[in-house]
Amino acid sequence: MSATAVEPAAAIETVTARRIIDSRGNPTVEVDVVLEDGSLGRAAVPSGASTGAREAVELRDEDPTRWHGKGVDRAVAHVNGEIAASVRGRDAADQAGLDAALIALDGTAAKSRLGANALLGVSLAAAKAAAAARRQPLYRYLGGADAHLLPLPMMNIVNGGAHADNPLDFQEFMIVPVGADTFAEAVRMGSEVFHTLRRDLLAAGHSTGVGDEGGFAPALRTAEEALDFVVAAIERTGYRAGPDIGLVMDPASSEFFRDGGYDYAGEGVRRSPAEHADHLAGLIDAYPVVSIEDPMAEDDLDGWRELTDRVGDRCQLTGDDVFCTDEALVREGIRTGVGNSVLVKVNQIGTLTEALATVATAHEAGWTVVMSHRSGETEDTTIADLAVATGCGQIKTGSLSRSDRTAKYNRLIRIEEELGASARFAGRSALRRV
């Protein structure tokens, strides 16, 4: 990354945090960093619903009389007070130094004193201010001259689990337009399937209300039902399930792992880890599933290793809760054979430098990386730039509805246009194993 080599130095003049509203109507932190030359960087911090136990701490006020306990006034105050005083005058171009100072200032392993939501807002806003000072888009500033790869999008079109009020145990069913030639074409293909699926669900008597991430949330009970609807929509749109558009699932298995087993409440069955793995392997065999996120629970490491041995050569197995964007946890996963891919959510770890280190470690091991949103999002499009900057080749940023999701797609469409002839679309090659 080239972010530490910016000249001339651009000193931070002011740091200002405020409370804004996320896509679920909950408060979140937004930070402005202004440099001495007037350059502005602004970043809004996302929030998750299904969170890993090892995530950095999102500081909430926990005052039940305001915002139902979800206020962020303490985090905002930390930014406007202690953090601003600490970073004022620092060189915004020294991202690693700035983030190290933020981590030291907090002084806790999980960033629980000041809050990861406070630290991340400053970290990202400083990077964007430094990019503005250099008159570069963020992807170019962070990624250098070689940043030209547009990511394969994982498009969430059916929601379940913690993201929807329906019986589906699995949290997300996604499509990936592996046969597209450009990012813009991938968006078109995804949008067409999304609207076909809407018509199909209506015709079958299902609701077409959407979940937190913009996918439909019909009252389906099994993964097979959801996958059948998605495959039919792909084919009715005129595409081939598999060669043109692959399938991705996120069971979010930690959410229904209880006392050593997997409780499928929607189906009304309980599966042992071995039975759960058998079920997933059966779905891979029966449908063109190219990737599964969190197939096993974060505390079921034996299950993770066994599933990786069993299907890891033909399916991307992406760790979210099990790694929480933590480089040390990813290194351990690489060493012990837990998965073959990592989901990167910058707010899980709390600084840009740490997130980029996780990406680098995964790439060095030959693992794939998926840049990801959270279920509670804003109009902030930073992750779109990060996907291009890192060349990770995959992005997960929700459905083809809700402007908090489509903002990221639109940003990537603009980046592809800006890159012109140098733009490359990752396509199927991003998955490597499929």
Curated annotation (Swiss-Prot):
Reactions this protein catalyses: (2R)-2-phosphoglycerate = phosphoenolpyruvate + H2O
Coiled-coil annotated spans: none
Database matches in InterPro entries: Enolase, Enolase-like_C_sf, Enolase-like_N, Enolase_C, Enolase_CS, Enolase_N
Entries under CDD domains matching the protein: enolase
EC number(s) on file: 4.2.1.11
GO biological-process terms attached to the record: glycolytic process
Residue numbers annotated as active site: 213, 345
Cofactor note: Binds a second Mg(2+) ion via substrate during catalysis.
PANTHER family: ENOLASE (PTHR11902:SF1)
Protein name: Enolase 2
Species in which this protein is naturally found: Streptomyces coelicolor (strain ATCC BAA-471 / A3(2) / M145)
